[in-house]
């Protein structure tokens, strides 16, 4: 347990530039507290103390705003940033080094027993407000964009955005570590493509063209910003 807790502290410091010291993480990070509370609740759950496990999970929910069923499996160095509103269901499995932002739901589909929640691979990043629903697999090193609704399996190293979630690219690890904070700008790319086609049609038809060229500020990728948070 202590080894896992040290790993959770290290994960918070590595992935959040606002976490300067381990002491601040220990006392001021509800996402870390939620993971710790779940580790205790899951330990009780595995040993058959189901009522105590549910009580521990409920206390953690009241304290942190994070609702993790004690039956869920949470890997090493999982970091829940900003914490509030995260829901993880009973049969969910979360791999190692996963980052989860506020408002994320790893939810079930239907009322049938058995496996009904997602399995999230190692080093996945799930953006704010995303919903991953059903017994699907999210492949290792994938990124789920903010507010995406994912209901189909995701291959490794994929980037998923939209409602319903669509794979629109590959996640590229950054040189300094596994976290590449870039997300494709689908609106900008679509607008750029549309304007290009209109310009070509006007050129073919000899119709009037507006003075100058109207284009989005940058097509394809927004650089230097983290749109997951």
Swiss-Prot record:
Predominant place of localization: cytoplasm
Database matches in InterPro entries: Hexapep (IPR001451), Hexapep_transf_CS (IPR018357), LbH_SAT (IPR045304), Ser_AcTrfase_N_sf (IPR042122), Ser_O-AcTrfase (IPR005881), Serine_acetyltransferase (IPR053376), Trimer_LpxA-like_sf (IPR011004)
PANTHER family: SERINE ACETYLTRANSFERASE (PTHR42811)
Catalytic activity: L-serine + acetyl-CoA = O-acetyl-L-serine + CoA
Superkingdom assignment: Bacteria
Pathway, per record: Amino-acid biosynthesis; L-cysteine biosynthesis; L-cysteine from L-serine: step 1/2
Any single Gene Ontology cellular-component annotation: cytosol
Alphabetized GO MF terms: serine O-acetyltransferase activity
Keywords carried by this UniProt record: Acyltransferase, Amino-acid biosynthesis, Cysteine biosynthesis, Cytoplasm, Repeat, Transferase
Designated gene of the protein: cysE
Further facts: Was identified as a high-confidence drug target.
Effects seen without this gene: Strains lacking this gene are shown to be attenuated in a mouse tuberculosis model.
Localization: Cytoplasm
Name of the protein in its database record: Serine acetyltransferase
One family name in Pfam for this protein: Hexapep
């Amino acid at each position: 347990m202590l080894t896992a807790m040290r790993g959770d502290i290290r994960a918070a410091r590595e992935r959040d530039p606002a976490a300067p010291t381990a002491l601040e993480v220990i006392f001021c990070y509800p996402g870390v507290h939620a993971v710790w509370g779940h580790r205790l609740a899951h330990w009780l759950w595995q040993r058959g103390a189901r009522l105590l496990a549910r009580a521990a999970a409920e206390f953690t929910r009241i304290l942190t705003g994070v609702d993790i069923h004690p039956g869920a499996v949470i890997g090493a160095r999982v970091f829940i940033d900003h914490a509030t509103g995260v829901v993880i269901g009973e049969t969910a499995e979360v791999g190692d080094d996963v980052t989860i932002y506020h408002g994320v739901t790893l939810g079930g589909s239907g009322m049938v027993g058995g496996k009904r929640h997602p399995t999230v691979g190692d080093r996945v990043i799930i953006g704010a407000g995303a919903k991953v629903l059903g017994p699907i697999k999210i492949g290792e090193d994938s990124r789920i964009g903010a507010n995406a609704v994912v209901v189909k399996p995701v291959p490794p190293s994929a980037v998923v955005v939209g409602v319903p979630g669509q794979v629109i690219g590959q996640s590229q690890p950054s040189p300094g570590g596994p976290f590449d904070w870039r997300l494709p700008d689908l609106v900008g790319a679509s607008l750029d493509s549309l304007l290009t086609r209109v310009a070509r049609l006007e050129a073919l038809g000899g119709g009037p063209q507006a003075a100058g060229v109207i284009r989005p500020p940058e097509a394809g990728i927004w650089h230097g910003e983290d749109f997951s948070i």
